């Protein structure tokens, strides 16, 4: 699956790495 920017941001945020 190819992640969109929104999905990537949400994934990182869920992991506690909010860099967007």
Curated annotation (Swiss-Prot):
Signal peptide boundaries: none
Role played: Lysozymes have primarily a bacteriolytic function; those in tissues and body fluids are associated with the monocyte-macrophage system and enhance the activity of immunoagents.
KW Zinc (keyword) present: no
Subunit comment: Monomer.
Name this protein carries in UniProt: Lysozyme C
BP term (GO), one: defense response to bacterium
Transmembrane parts of this sequence: none
Keywords of this entry: Antimicrobial, Bacteriolytic enzyme, Glycosidase, Hydrolase, Milk protein
Broad enzyme group: hydrolase
EC number(s) per entry: 3.2.1.17
Organism listed in the record: Felis catus
Other remarks on this protein: Lysozyme C is capable of both hydrolysis and transglycosylation; it also shows a slight esterase activity. It acts rapidly on both peptide-substituted and unsubstituted peptidoglycan, and slowly on chitin oligosaccharides.
UniProt similarity note: Belongs to the glycosyl hydrolase 22 family.
Catalytic activity: Hydrolysis of (1->4)-beta-linkages between N-acetylmuramic acid and N-acetyl-D-glucosamine residues in a peptidoglycan and between N-acetyl-D-glucosamine residues in chitodextrins
Molecular function per GO: lysozyme activity
